[in-house]
């Protein structure tokens, strides 16, 4: 994973407009389940890792099929709120359950550069969402 990381001088700070723009585009892509939009914000060498899992993906052409097949689902399955975690742009993720309620899923922390998202680290722990002062659920009729 270390070889896949961008150089420290390539990382864009979360307060910079480009970092906020990439985070907003990432969130929008997830909320409308648009793999093509997600492809546009990921760097060609993007890495995806899920904390607690031994599996990780390196390269946009490896990350996207996994996300499109197993994660994105249908438009409206996800709702994300922009946050800052560990000093980086991040999203608090909520996933729609069978009853229609959006329940906390976890946190996705992004490493962004001027050329796109270089790394996504997913902490799939619903309890982390509430540590940011956010609710456990967003309700059945929550609009994105």
Language-model segments: what does each one mean?
Residues 1-73, 77-79:
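Solvent-exposed, charged amphipathic helical/linker segments at domain boundaries
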Residues 64-144:
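Low-complexity, glycine/alanine/valine/leucine- and proline-rich hydrophobic stretches
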